[in-house]
Amino acid sequence: MSREKIAETARNFESFHGEITYDQMKCNQFVLAVLREAVDPKFPDLRADDFPASGRFAKVESPLRGDLVHWPGHIGIVIDPNRFEFIGSQDSTGVAAASYSKGYWNGAYGGKQPDCFLRYVE
């Protein structure tokens, strides 16, 4: 199943590449690197805001492990929907896990709330 492979690749990427800073890898570059390893080595380049309209993903109401979480200008990969956890490349942390249900990634401190969840369409 692609979703599980996407989630595992993201988690492994975080473990091995957690020292990569945002200046070295933008959020879309992280997601693309994971998708290219887990799904398709020729996955096309997309900016964060291109993912929802790319035709490669379906919007879903309830995310599952391996789905994408999108904000205006930002994208990440859902790792644990029960804990509202995603992995992305953030300005403050580089490639790391964070929560999309509290703090900055849920609208606190001037941050943005997720606007959609996306599931890869095989």
Predicted feature residues:
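Aromatic- and glycine-rich peptidoglycan recognition patches
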Residues: 15-19, 49-51, 55-58, 79-122
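N-terminal capping segments
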Residues: 1-55, 72-73, 87
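Residue "hotspots" at secondary-structure boundaries inside conserved domains
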Residues: 61-62
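Loop/turn positions that initiate beta-strands
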Residues: 65-66
